[in-house]
Amino acid sequence: MDRYPTIESLINEARARIEVTKAELDEARRRRAGIAAALASEFPGSRHYVNGSVAHGDALTPLTDVDLGVVIPNPEGHYGPGKKGPGELQERAAAAIRRGLADEYGHLRVEFRGRKRSIRVSFRDPIREGLPDFTADVIIAIDFPDGRGLYIPRFDSWDRADPETHTALVTAANRRTESVYARTVRLLKHWNRRNGEVLCSWNIKALALTCVDSKEALVTTMRSWFNHAVQELRKGGTEDPARVTDRPIKLNAPRAEVVKRLEDALAKLDKAIMYDRAGYPTLAQKELADLFNDPDMLEAPPKDAVLRDGVRFHAPQGAPSRAFGAPVIAQTGAGPAAATPAAATPVRSWAP
């Protein structure tokens, strides 16, 4: 396993600050179970599936939503592309949720008309005082008749998808990596939120499925993900990991902009790694703080300490060398990109 003198502990401390609490998870699961019970009563023989951050183990605090799907029997084949759309089933599901939860949540609001995919359940009752409203996104689905996956709503029609396989793939990755996959995704989701949110959460997870596959240091797995994401998105969009649709996962910004943000983030992380291994933890912390762009999660060191270490770094007697561990790193492959003292200036780099 790669060793990092100080930044791995900084990353783990930062991760703990954004990790969802057990109380939040317990309450979210309780509310999700109430919706599932209401839907099971309305649709005998149905099955439900869970997905999203709570199911995948990568939820951030504060937790404000949960996801649930219900697969409704369609033995006569009345529903599907070229047949009935999802509206009738969504209306029944919405009514069942209202009946099942109204006694506990007197201001409950359930909406589906005009929405692309989900029924939105607004509890109007935060799971903790001071938080925004808690919501649930509920997907009604039918089995794909000729193979793997489901049909899920797309406004008044249907799209093929396989959210059950998605959750199975994530669960397997968490088991294989002893939850390093989920911890890495949580950090990347927070980075994404604080830096333009150019990727949806599922794109982050899908990319991680092919590069975060063992128990490694979080700095290593984050670095592997940024490198992999840059390479893949330069070529095109991210494919569906379940391989049931040919459409790539949608980006939230032009692809060139997304790639540029990823390249900049990779450069900051590489500088943090280089400083850390060279014995300049203050400069390494500054690069990590710039990367995440959230002082509540990871605070930048004092400016005078950064300037002092910057002077020491650039002084001839303090310049990194192989003698005390500064890495000589190739530009290609999974390892950190090459960084030289001239490139590693102690100033704010690549401001988001």
Task: For each feature predicted by the language model, list its residue ranges.
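Conserved catalytic core of two-metal-ion nucleotidyltransferases
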Residues: 34, 86-147
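Terminal (often C-terminal) interaction modules
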Residues: 1-9, 240-352
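Acidic/Ser/Thr-rich, low-complexity mid-to-C-terminal regulatory regions of eukaryotic proteins
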Residues: 135-183
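A long, hydrophobic alpha-helical segment
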Residues: 168-214
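N-terminal regions immediately upstream of nucleotidyltransferase
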Residues: 1-50, 55-63, 74-88, 341-342, ...
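Hydrophobic, mid-to-C-terminal alpha-helical segments
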Residues: 198-239
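Flexible, surface-exposed loop/gating regions in the mature catalytic domains
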Residues: 69, 110-112, 118-123, 150-160, ...
